[in-house]
Amino acid sequence: MSNETNANSTDSRQGVTNIGSVPAYLVLADGRTFKGFGFGAIGTTLGEAVFTTAMTGYQETMTDPSYHRQIVVATAPQIGNTGWNEEDNESHDGSIWVAGLVIRDLAVRVSNWRATTTLQEEMAKQGVVGIGGIDTRALVRHIRNEGAVPAGIFSGADAERPIEELVEIVKSQPSMVGANLAVEVSVDKPYVIEAEGEARHTVVAYDLGIKQNTPRRFAARGVRTVIVPAETPFEEIKQYNPSGVFISNGPGDPAAADIMVNIVREVLAADIPFFGICFGNQILGRAFGMETYKLKFGHRGINVPVKNHITGKIDITAQNHGFALKGEAGQEFETDFGTAVVTHTCLNDGVVEGVALKSGRAYSVQYHPEAAAGPNDASPLFDQFVALMDEDSENQKEEA
């Protein structure tokens, strides 16, 4: 169906538009515009335009809280083929966190036995604005060359306003630089994911935008996980007598997360085993005294090669980050907690992908070993954390 038609029609399902019937524009802050058709919710959404190279896993991507305030461009040519199910949500309550979705082609037929609804229906239900019919190859090249850029999707009546006016609306949105967004996606109160079988350890996990596959990974290893809100004071988590502390992935600028940095410094000073993922890697790095910076267009995909400079091993990883730590492969430096080292870097561009204390008491990676979606190459990082807690437990028994 042509996306040039002006008719705004809906089918028998409330709020679901017929593909191509609603005009829409993707507008970038630099003045570049793309005409397409609206789907999902109809209206306006603003966010930073970023792209993901993942060919699968759009549901996991869209429900990942790390994508808060970002309009995600899918490089896969067709999205929606597997519909939407109740099992693959990565947010705690099934919420979609992307600000908007940009695609080339919207699948009209769902082909997955687990699907309970379509992508378009779920987006309409949750009020998420999408635009299709876009030359995503040209758009991704533009973002790659010019960098992630503020953007807006305008569909329906909103798309009829003058382009100059839409550009000004896009320009007026707040920057990702300096944005402390983890508190906006975190839970309000603690909750527990029990271990499968007898619990060997209890881990306190700070929810800065945690994906649900993380506590699942812990549970499968006999670890009880207490998920606490971002910025929960260190003194409060002592009540759980944690064997280890975990900091999750999350959105925003790590340079604005001073409270979390100070909490991690308290954890390190108490010599409690520490593991961090993604945003947690940046927080640990800052606790070590490292600086962060914003990447030009970030790393987002499920096929990113990372080298472990301690073992020499290369993993294919899932990634989603727009900020990174400043450092070099194998770099060693002194911290208030002992000697630290840059353990991992990305083979594509040399970006820091992991740091650790040489003592082994604290470590983190920039990528997502929990996957969802993505490869499982890095899942042994969870085993490493459990082994560290096992060692502590054995030492405590010997001392007793």
Curated annotation (Swiss-Prot):
Binding-site residues, L-glutamine: S66, G250, G252, F279, Q282, N320, G322, F323
Catalytic activity: hydrogencarbonate + L-glutamine + 2 ATP + H2O = carbamoyl phosphate + L-glutamate + 2 ADP + phosphate + 2 H(+)
Pathway: Amino-acid biosynthesis; L-arginine biosynthesis; carbamoyl phosphate from bicarbonate: step 1/1; Pyrimidine metabolism; UMP biosynthesis via de novo pathway; (S)-dihydroorotate from bicarbonate: step 1/3
Subunit structure: Composed of two chains; the small (or glutamine) chain promotes the hydrolysis of glutamine to ammonia, which is used by the large (or ammonia) chain to synthesize carbamoyl phosphate. Tetramer of heterodimers (alpha,beta)4.
Source organism superkingdom: Bacteria
Record keywords: Amino-acid biosynthesis, Arginine biosynthesis, ATP-binding, Glutamine amidotransferase, Ligase, Nucleotide-binding, Pyrimidine biosynthesis
Database matches in Gene3D superfamilies: 3.40.50.880, Carbamoyl-phosphate synthase small subunit, N-terminal domain (3.50.30.20)
Protein purpose: Small subunit of the glutamine-dependent carbamoyl phosphate synthetase (CPSase). CPSase catalyzes the formation of carbamoyl phosphate from the ammonia moiety of glutamine, carbonate, and phosphate donated by ATP, constituting the first step of 2 biosynthetic pathways, one leading to arginine and/or urea and the other to pyrimidine nucleotides. The small subunit (glutamine amidotransferase) binds and cleaves glutamine to supply the large subunit with the substrate ammonia.
Molecular functions (GO terms): ATP binding; carbamoyl-phosphate synthase (glutamine-hydrolyzing) activity; glutaminase activity
UniProt EC number: 6.3.5.5
Key word Nucleotide-binding present: yes
Active-site residues, Swiss-Prot/TrEMBL: C278 (nucleophile), H368, E370
Family the entry assigns: Belongs to the CarA family.
Pfam family, one: CPSase_sm_chain
InterPro entries for this protein: Anth_synth/Amidotransfase, CarbamoylP_synth_ssu, CarbamoylP_synth_ssu_N, CarbP_synth_ssu_N_sf, Class_I_gatase-like, CPSase_GATase1, GATASE
Gene this protein is translated from: carA
Domain called Glutamine amidotransferase type-1: residue spans: 200-395
Segments for region (CPSase): 1-199
Stated name of the protein: Carbamoyl phosphate synthase small chain
Gene Ontology biological-process entries: 'de novo' pyrimidine nucleobase biosynthetic process; 'de novo' UMP biosynthetic process; glutamine metabolic process; L-arginine biosynthetic process
